Design a protein with these regions (language model features):
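Beta-strand-rich recognition domains
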Residues: 1-140
Length: 140
């Protein structure tokens, strides 16, 4: 409980002879859906901050909602601060959305993406639950 965590949708790559059950990579069109399971009881232990990291094949605009709530606030510094740019190759891009803590639920969370751009591909999804400082609550 109250440990910093990251929940992720795999990019679909196989490792250790295991093939993940993931919808990624996923072409983002109008109302493209992906689900992410959150094991934490976020109602009992509300995180200080929830951050949704989205990696796409290129930099382009798109919209995203979680459980029906549209996400508006982006923090351009977070991909670097949370070390999400390591291994990223041009023209890939990582966007960090701030998620209201009351939007996320324990269990399956529905994420809906929409983009008008052609061939915008969702490559990775990570949802970070920040409960406190690294010293108090551990690394992500």
């Amino acid at each position: 409980r109250k440990r910093n965590k990251i929940y992720a949708l795999s990019d679909g790559a196989s490792s250790y002879e295991l093939t993940p059950n993931s919808p990624l990579p996923l072409l983002i069109q109008q109302n493209t859906e992906a689900g992410i399971f959150i094991g934490d009881d976020v109602n009992a232990d509300e995180p200080q901050e929830v951050i949704l990291f989205i990696r796409t094949n290129k930099k382009d605009s798109f919209s995203v909602s979680i459980n029906g709530s549209a996400l508006q606030q982006i923090n351009a510094d977070y991909p670097r601060l949370y070390d999400k740019l390591t291994g990223i190759k041009e023209p890939q891009h990582v966007t960090a959305f701030i998620v209201p803590a009351n939007v996320v639920i324990q269990g399956n969370n529905k994420i809906v993406f929409s983009a008008s751009a052609n061939e915008l591909i969702l490559q990775r999804v990570e949802l970070a639950l920040k409960y406190g400082s690294v010293e108090e609550c551990g690394y992500f």
